[in-house]
Design a protein with these regions (language model features):
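Sterically constrained small-residue positions within well-ordered secondary structures
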Residues: 48, 68, 81, 108-110
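Beta-strand secondary-structure signal
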Residues: 54-56, 89, 116-120
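Glycine-rich active-site loops that engage anionic ligands at enzyme catalytic sites
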Residues: 56-97
Length: 124
């Protein structure tokens, strides 16, 4: 899903990510900071592990925030360059990219077993 603050360009918004270690980039948004021209298309390990976390994008000029909450251990974030940066893609994930080869965080299901994941999107 894409988070947006009334389709305002995300460059003017502040972002907070629940990351403990970043797998692809050296920039962290562990405290609210302006996205500006930062391009993100990366996977992050979430923090705290196995607990609910929140990605929050805030528009100071509109005094509003949108957020996504989940408890998955991984998170994909994309700054939407192909969409004129009008939204921030946030995808909770059960494992990092290439997990079938690395085996990291794979969930093994026996025939007939199920695995469910949930997330919540909201605005304030």
């Amino acid at each position: 899903p894409y988070l947006t603050c009334n389709l305002q360009p995300i460059d003017d918004c502040e972002l907070t990510l629940p990351v403990s270690e970043e797998t692809c980039d050296e920039r962290y948004f562990t405290k609210p900071q302006r996205i500006a021209q930062t391009a993100i298309d990366h996977t992050f390990r979430t923090m705290p592990p196995d607990a609910e976390w929140e990605v929050r994008m805030t528009s100071p000029s509109q005094n509003m925030s949108t957020f996504l909450r989940s408890h998955q251990p991984w998170l994909q974030v994309y700054t939407g360059e192909k969409l004129a940066r009008r939204g921030l893609a946030v995808e909770p994930m059960t494992c990092p990219p290439d997990a079938f080869n690395s085996g990291i965080s794979l969930i093994h299901l026996a025939p007939g077993e199920q695995h469910q994941m949930h997330f919540l999107i909201g605005s304030e």
